């Protein structure tokens, strides 16, 4: 499960690098993955790899 958000299941996107002459070369846009620890209802801790965007959303909802 490399380079995937474990909550939203988002993965890397593909696109192009563009030079000044507008030459296109393939590249990959990776997520900003961070490791967080969440507590389950039973009090058990689990570690997840989530993107910074998901982490921000969880903080907004009061989960982190």
Swiss-Prot record:
Residues 1-23 are annotated as: Disordered. GO terms for molecular function: structural constituent of ribosome. GO terms for cellular component: ribonucleoprotein complex; ribosome. InterPro entries: Bacterial_rp_bL28 (IPR050096), Ribosomal_bL28 (IPR026569), Ribosomal_bL28/bL31-like_sf (IPR034704), Ribosomal_bL28_bact-type (IPR001383), Ribosomal_bL28_sf (IPR037147). GO terms for biological process: translation. Pfam families: Ribosomal_L28. Keywords: Ribonucleoprotein, Ribosomal protein. Belongs to the bacterial ribosomal protein bL28 family. HAMAP family: Ribosomal_bL28. NCBIfam families: L28 (TIGR00009). This is Large ribosomal subunit protein bL28. It comes from Mesomycoplasma hyopneumoniae (strain 7448) (Mycoplasma hyopneumoniae).
